[in-house]
Amino acid sequence: MICQFKRLIYPKAVTAGDASYMIALYRPCEKVMDAAGNVVSEIKAVGYCLPTADNLRYDMRGRWSRSAKHGIQFEVEGFDEVIVPSKEGVIAYLCSGQIKGIGPKTAEKIYAMFGQNTLTVLDHEPEQLLAVSGISKTKLKKICDSYLASRGARDVVAFLAPHGVTPNRAVKLYKQFGEHTMDIVRNHPYRLCEMVGVGFKTADRIAVSMGFDPLSPERVDEGLMFTLTDAELKGHLCMEKHSFLKQCLKLLDTEGLTEEMLAVRASRMLESGRLASYDRQVYRAVTARTEQSLAWAVYRMLTYEKAGSHVNIDTEISAEEKKQGIQLASEQRHAVTTALTSQLSVITGGPGTGKTLIQRFLLDIYRRKNRGAKIICCAPTGRAARRMEQATGFPATTIHKALGLLAGEDGDYCEPEMLDADLIVVDEVSMMDIYLANHLFRSVPHGSQLVLIGDADQLPSVGPGAVLSEIIACGAVPVVRLDRIFRQSYGSRIAANAKLIRHGNLSLEYGEDFQFYDSCDMSTSAQQIETLYLQETAKYGVDNVALLTPYRQKTETGVNALNERLREKLNPQDGKKPEVAYRKRIYRLGDKVMQIKNCEDISNGDIGYITSVTRDDTDSVLTVDFGDGRIAEYDGSDLEMLDLAYASTIHKSQGSEYKSVIINLQCAHAVMLVRPLVYTAITRAKERVLIVGERRALCIAIKRTDTEQRGTMLSARIKELISNVKGDHYNGNLAQ
């Protein structure tokens, strides 16, 4: 039936492409009879992703239903726009709000260039729109995605919306599977697990709603895969056989399903190559290949000849000491010597032990000894790289940029480039997960030296693996551990207390540079944090103060709540500052923000300030200045990449350093209270640490080592390659 949008009943307002459940009234444009045979003057329609542009007509598909509570209503199963083949009709469709990035002015320009061929261009040659002034590559992508959602992917978007799949994700599914998407969704829902962001639980909900057999091999196989994928999200590369099967059985929760049945399916997946095993551990095949690849790369570097003579290095170190007016301690001298004479080496230690000084000596001596040699300094995050550059005086970049790794639409990365360097120095190595480490090691040219620097006692990487700890544990890589604290200036209690925490010692020393503020409830803590934050930022400046807390959400002292609270103190709305609302967040001119996804020029974790808020034909555009001449613009869904940055999680602070750090620790933080967490938090500070919360929470964290050791066999694989002795591997049969 042909009809036109009249008004929304529920919800009260929606944005374009909203995937929520909707109830709306439509005006029929032709004679329409309801389920009772009555001619109607308006239609109450229900469904997901209903059209709300009042300047278009729609051909609605679906069925009438009747209930005692809601009466007669039309359940929408799909719809198409009725586009009048005229200038007015095409322009009305283009600027109806369903195609992001096209407003009235842009619609006029497009029609002026393509006329009645406009929709053909959108369907088959959308790149031609780049010829229209005002349409950039970024805007073209937005136009294409929303046009696809409003046309070919519409049925997919509507079908998946009740199952929690966002319109953006549904459009990506449509891009991947094309015209076969609906067939796959209805008949092979577990194939949706192939798509990044659509996990087993979503696919399972869809399958169950359509009556799939809960004991089907397809469901069991994807349950096994999801069990391992979920473990990777928690930092593990692999799972022990029995733990793996037990966890999957709990996930599938199906009557009649046993561990023995799961073992048979898992064995077949081993045979087909979807799973892999090593020494009674089970992996996703791609993860096992990555771990083995990294082990081979480490082994390969260990087989190279030594890089230089100790005698020459001793002379060079003495000359550098004289030049800098500093005398290295014996362990620091040993670290520089090891790095310069080894193809692969590790330098690890806590704050105040001289890691930065060692880097300066290492780089200066290497450059003097090897004139014309190429050096690359890098770190996992942009902030860590800039800190490395400031401390050493050598240019530094992120590992991703050094390798030419640019994230694609779904977070996948292209193949890394071979590094053009003779010496590669990597800082903050504890933040590297198995995948980034494998990319890095595979890109080191034959004969080049690699120096890994980091603190093995910090939190492990967000991604899976424990790369730094495992490389140290293999016992084959030259490792220098720095344990002696040399920092004697203001803030020395920080380094001393960090060492105590590392050893589980509760006898911390308090004073002007290390303070504790008792507060047993969240509300009092939030108020105390606000007072201290305003005090510290007034003294040191906003950029030199960090507010760190374990949780993002849930409490008054979570990152989200603190960000809103502090923004209203530091950057309040005075009625003149333009701002943009996106989802549940407001971005305001002058706000301090953080990039939370790697882009070509801006790295995950980079912090900047919103310098302008403008509006183009359809969207508000934010301009963010990240410093060092790096300026980026954000509009529409790009805002997903920004977060307020007055407060941060402790995990997100890794690789950063501040003059003053405020930390919140409450007993309610429960499972987050582990030694590496509090150690990482306090070692972000150079001059002052202010802890707000419960002393018992601090004691729990110090006494509690990481709750669960990460499942990884990297160290064992390296040892096996060195010894050339095969381990106790599976024969491919998990049913044994």
PLM feature segments, named:
Residues 1-311, 736:
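Accessory, non-ATPase domains that flank or precede helicase/AAA+ motor cores in DNA-metabolism machines
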Residues 355:
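Conserved lysine of the Walker
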Residues 341, 346, 361, 365, ...:
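Conserved helicase motor core of SF1/SF2 NTP-dependent helicases
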Residues 339, 350, 380, 550:
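P-loop (Walker A) phosphate-binding loop of NTP-binding proteins
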Residues 325-341:
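N-terminal pre-P-loop "Q-motif" helix
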Residues 55-59, 590, 605:
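Loop/turn positions that initiate beta-strands
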Residues 606-617, 621-736:
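C-terminal accessory regions
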Residues 456-601, 611, 721, 729:
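Conserved helicase motor core of P-loop NTPases
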